[in-house]
C-alpha cells in the first residue's frame, strides 16, 4: 500500500467543477456520421489510457483496446459487420428490439466503420495468465470493461471528437478478424473521429434526475 494523494477543494469549487463537467457531458452526442478527416494516433492513445484508469475487479484491468486505422482492415471489418447485421435485421431481431431502434433510424449499413479514421474495438479478458504460466479467472470483467468504456467515451468527448457505441450481433467475427486470443471476447466497437459537416443525431431527451435516482437521507 502507498499513501492516497488527495487534495480537498473548497465546496464552491467542488460544485462549480461538478456543474462544468455535467454541462460538458450534456453536450456529448452519439452520431453515425463521421468525417474522414485524420485524427493523430496520440489522441487515441490518450483516450485508451483514460479508459485504463477505470477501477476493475481485483485491479486485473481485464481489457484490451484494439485501435484500427488501416483502411483495408476497416473495410474487412465493415463487410463482416454488415453481413451479420443484415442477418440480424432480416431474421434474428426480436420485435421488442426493433421497436426501440425505430426512432434511431439504424439499419445494416455501417458507413461509420470506414468513414471514421479510427475504429477501436474493446475486448473483455475472461481469464488471465498467472506468473507461473497457469491460467486463472478474472473477476467482474464485464462491469470493469463497462466502466473503462465510459471513461474512454468521456475522454473522446473532452478532446472534441465523437464516437459511437456499436455492437454488431453476434461479434465473434471480431476475434478472428483481429487475431485476438481465445480468452478475449469483443464487447464494443467504437469508431472515433470528427463529425461529418452534415452529421445528424436523433432528437432525443435524457431522463430527469427523479427518473433515474432514489435518495435515502
Predicted features by range, described:
Residues 1-115, 217:
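N-terminal amphipathic, basic helical "cap/leader" segment at the start of enzyme domains
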Residues 47-51, 120, 126-177:
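Small-aliphatic-rich amphipathic alpha-helix that forms the alpha element of a beta-alpha
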Amino acid at each position: 500500500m502507498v499513501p492516497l494523494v488527495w487534495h480537498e477543494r473548497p465546496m464552491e469549487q467542488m460544485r462549480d467543477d461538478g456543474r462544468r463537467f455535467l454541462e460538458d457531458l450534456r453536450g456529448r452526442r452519439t452520431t453515425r456520421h463521421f468525417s474522414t478527416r485524420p485524427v493523430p494516433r496520440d489522441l487515441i492513445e490518450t483516450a485508451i489510457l483514460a479508459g485504463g484508469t477505470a477501477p476493475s475487479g481485483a485491479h486485473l484491468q481485464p481489457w484490451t483496446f484494439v485501435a484500427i486505422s488501416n483502411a483495408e482492415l476497416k473495410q474487412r471489418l465493415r463487410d463482416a459487420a454488415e453481413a451479420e447485421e443484415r442477418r440480424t435485421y432480416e431474421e434474428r431481431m426480436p420485435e421488442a428490439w426493433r421497436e426501440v431502434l425505430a426512432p434511431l433510424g439504424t439499419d445494416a449499413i455501417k458507413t461509420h466503420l470506414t468513414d471514421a479514421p479510427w475504429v477501436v474495438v474493446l475486448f473483455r479478458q475472461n481469464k488471465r495468465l498467472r506468473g507461473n504460466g497457469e491460467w486463472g479467472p478474472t473477476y467482474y470483467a464485464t462491469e470493469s470493461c463497462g466502466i473503462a468504456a465510459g471513461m474512454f467515451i468521456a475522454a473522446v468527448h473532452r478532446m472534441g471528437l465523437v464516437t459511437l457505441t456499436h455492437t454488431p450481433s453476434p461479434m465473434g467475427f471480431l476475434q478472428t478478424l483481429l487475431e485476438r486470443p481465445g480468452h478475449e471476447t469483443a464487447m464494443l466497437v467504437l469508431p472515433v473521429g470528427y463529425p461529418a459537416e452534415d452529421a445528424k443525431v436523433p432528437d432525443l431527451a435524457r431522463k430527469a434526475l427523479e427518473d433515474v435516482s432514489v435518495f435515502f437521507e
